[in-house]
Swiss-Prot record:
Family: Belongs to the SsuD family.
Family matches, as InterPro entries: Alkanesulphonate_mOase_FMN-dep, Luciferase-like_dom, Luciferase-like_sf, SsuD_RutA_monooxygenase
Gene3D superfamilies, alphabetized: Luciferase-like domain (3.20.20.30)
UniProt keywords, alphabetically: Flavoprotein, FMN, Monooxygenase, Oxidoreductase
Record field: catalytic activity: an alkanesulfonate + FMNH2 + O2 = an aldehyde + FMN + sulfite + H2O + 2 H(+)
Protein name (Swiss-Prot/TrEMBL): Alkanesulfonate monooxygenase
Organism of provenance: Enterobacter sp. (strain 638)
Subunit structure: Homotetramer.
Miscellaneous notes: FMNH(2) which is absolutely required for this enzymatic reaction, is provided by SsuE.
């Protein structure tokens, strides 16, 4: 099975070390362009663009990177409860059209009550997933060309439709990650690819089996992906030394503050990540070559595969054997580590290198009439 390898645009900051300004670098348009173009040339399938108040806006960053790349896809966040499904569908179709079919979408329900309140969202964990399920039903149908009337607990729309369809048919793929039961239920019913953070293989296997069974109950099949950091070097010793350097400026106070902040979220996945290290610097290799040091101060993906190219490739293939075909990777600093992965890891994997999409013929149409319908050229009889 060929693997889809993604990279990451660090719109929330980048550098050589975690938890310090030492070795940090400014993340501006030029730097993001460097990373995107490197990922494009190396052969990554796409890049994940993070979302949240500590990040630049993912949609604007993706739009800015489209003209400077050729084949790279952009995985951007859909935020139910923050934006309506109708507006989100129009945005998604536009991004897909502007990129000639290089748009992918990641459903993000949110987990930080403080950040959500700042965005005007006051739903609890279960309610957010209810709203996300309703949002996704409407969003999918609109992109598939339906005119949608929907009456739900959280979402109500009447005669909603898109005038400009996406390039990818029937619609761009939808990604989603969540570890709770309600999250898995949503994935089983609605999404195309279920994501997990980088837990040990036995834990990932359990989640995959649960989601696969729930999807089968809906008569569906779901693909699987995993989100991991990587530290790959020419030798295993060099890789582990690089891992130690990454957290060499962390002090106990910074770790404690980070863990206290992350504990406030209601994310089951975040709590599972925290349980892998329990805020302690000792015994961070939680599974062969799987290192939990990143999670001492970083929310979300908190583990890294560490080793030389053949070793990291072997661990990736262990996850692939569980049914995972997509790997969303990152490493510090993201520009240099992209090249490390391309040069030291890619040769040891069966990597699906994306092709440059060819221009597609556009449908002839006139200006919208009274904002109600679009005149189109009719076939001659």
């Amino acid at each position: 099975m060929s693997l889809n390898l993604f990279w990451f645009l660090p719109t929330h900051g980048d550098g050589h070390y975690l938890g310090t300004e030492e070795g940090a670098r400014p993340v501006d348009y030029g730097y993001l362009q460097q990373i995107a173009q490197a990922a494009d040339r190396i052969g990554f399938t796409g890049v994940l663009i993070p979302t949240g108040r500590s990040c630049e806006d993912a949609w604007l960053v993706a739009a800015a990177m489209i003209p400077v790349t050729q084949r790279l896809k952009f995985l951007v966040a859909l935020r139910p409860s923050v934006v309506s499904p109708t507006v989100a569908a129009r945005q998604a179709a536009t991004l897909d059209r502007l990129s000639n079919g290089r748009a992918l979408f990641n459903l993000v329900t949110g987990s930080d009550p403080t950040e959500l309140a700042g965005d005007g969202v006051f739903l609890d964990h279960t309610e957010r997933y209810e709203a996300s399920a309703e949002f996704t039903r409407v969003w999918r149908r609109l992109l598939e060309g339906d005119t949608v009337t929907y009456e739900g607990k959280h979402i109500r729309v009447r005669d909603a439709k898109l005038y400009f369809p996406p390039v990818q048919q029937p619609r761009p793929p939808l990604y989603f990650g969540g570890s709770s039961d309600v999250a898995q239920d949503l994935a089983a019913e609605q999404v195309d690819l279920y994501l997990t953070w980088g837990e040990p293989p036995e834990q990932v296997k359990e989640k995959i089996e649960q989601v696969r069974a729930k999807a089968a109950a809906h008569g569906r099949k779901v693909r699987f992906g995993i989100r991991l950091h990587v530290i790959v070097r020419e030798t295993n010793q060099e890789a582990w030394q690089a891992a130690d350097r990454l957290i060499s400026h962390l002090d106990d106070d910074t770790i404690a503050k980070a863990q206290a902040a992350l504990a406030k979220t209601d994310s089951v996945g975040q709590h599972r990540m925290a349980s892998l290290h329990n805020g302690k610097r000792e015994n961070l290799e939680i599974s062969p070559n799987l290192w939990a040091g990143v999670g001492l101060v970083r929310g979300g993906a908190g583990t890294a595969l560490v080793g030389d190219g053949p070793t990291v490739a072997a661990r990736i293939n262990e996850y692939a054997d569980l049914g995972i075909d997509s790997f969303i990777l990152s490493g510090y600093p993201h520009l240099e580590e992209a090249y490390n992965v391309g040069e030291l890891l890619f040769p040891h994997l069966d990597v699906a290198i994306p092709e440059i999409p060819q221009p597609r013929p556009l449908q002839v149409q006139g200006e919208a009439v009274a904002n109600e319908f679009i005149p189109r050229k009719t076939a001659q009889s």
